[in-house]
Amino acid sequence: MTYATEFPDFPAAAMPAVPDGFADRSWRNEPCPCFIHEASGIVLWIDYPANGELRDCARFVVQRCTNRSAEAGWQFDGGLIDVFQSDDWRAITA
């Protein structure tokens, strides 16, 4: 699965270059595309540029997974800890 197949209405021009080490874990039942860093469990949510799906959040949200399965890797259920959020992509990648 990729964000392009799971969110076909997400404008490709609005998707920033995701940093190395992040894998696309987007799933259509989530509010927007997401990427996970398997080594650290950091999750990066990238919301639509207009009319965002993430309520009460900035366009770019960084969270950390707290539940890791030996079979399936990091799991979103079991809790996500908010790390940082911003509407400025440069602040996320700094």
Predicted region positions:
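Negatively charged, low-complexity tracts enriched in Asp/Glu with abundant Ser/Thr
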Residues: 1-40
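Low-complexity, intrinsically disordered/propeptide-like segments
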Residues: 10-13, 83, 87
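Short intrinsically disordered terminal tails
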Residues: 1-3, 90-94
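Intrinsically disordered, low-complexity regulatory segments enriched in Ser/Thr/Pro
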Residues: 41-86
